[in-house]
UniProtKB/Swiss-Prot annotation:
Family matches, as PANTHER family: 60S RIBOSOMAL PROTEIN L17
Subunit structure: Part of the 50S ribosomal subunit.
Protein name: Large ribosomal subunit protein uL22
GO molecular function: rRNA binding; structural constituent of ribosome
Organism encoding this protein: Methanocella arvoryzae (strain DSM 22066 / NBRC 105507 / MRE50)
Taxonomy of the source species: Archaea, Methanobacteriati, Methanobacteriota, Stenosarchaea group, Methanomicrobia
Keywords associated with the record: Ribonucleoprotein, Ribosomal protein, RNA-binding, rRNA-binding
Length: 153
């Protein structure tokens, strides 16, 4: 297992961070969710992700939008989806970052997500047997997600 660090450096006195290492979710879904929650207040991001899990609000798919249907209630971008599994994992990650901020003595009421990104992790090799003695690759892509929250002044 290789050592994975954060992609950016921030002031540890005013920020708290958390990382989910090699989780089994879609890399494309994580990228779109991280883009959407970046810059949000922590409480608003948690509410937003809970609404995505409940399928009340959708996540706009900007880069991976091929064959993605339009959503009526979404403003600003037509295509979107409801990535429930990835939203659940990122919501857990935000709760961990909030707990880290409370442990450091920071005020969590006015925290904002200043950095969120996803990176490719390992690929677990797998095969699926096919007819006539052939086989198809059936791999599992893992994702590393990192979140940094900071105080708003």
């Amino acid at each position: 297992m290789s050592k994975v660090g954060y992609t950016a450096e921030f002031d540890p006195a005013t920020t708290a961070k958390a990382m989910a290492y090699e989780i089994n979710v879609s890399p494309k879904h994580c990228q779109e969710i991280c883009r959407q929650i970046r810059g949000m207040k922590l409480s608003a991001a948690k509410t937003y992700l809970q609404d995505v899990i409940d399928k009340k609000r959708s996540v706009p798919f900007k880069q991976h939008a091929r064959n993605v249907g339009h959503k009526r209630h979404q403003s600003g971008w037509p295509s979107g989806r409801y990535p429930v599994k990835a939203s659940t994992e990122i919501l857990k990650l935000l709760k961990h970052a909030e707990a880290n901020a409370e442990y450091k003595g920071l005020e969590t009421e006015n925290m904002r997500i200043i950095h969120s990104t996803s990176k490719k992790g390992r690929v677990i090799q797998g095969i699926m047997p096919r007819a006539m003695g052939r086989a198809t690759a059936w791999n599992i892509e893992l994702v590393t997600v990192e979140v940094v929250i900071g105080e708003v002044r």
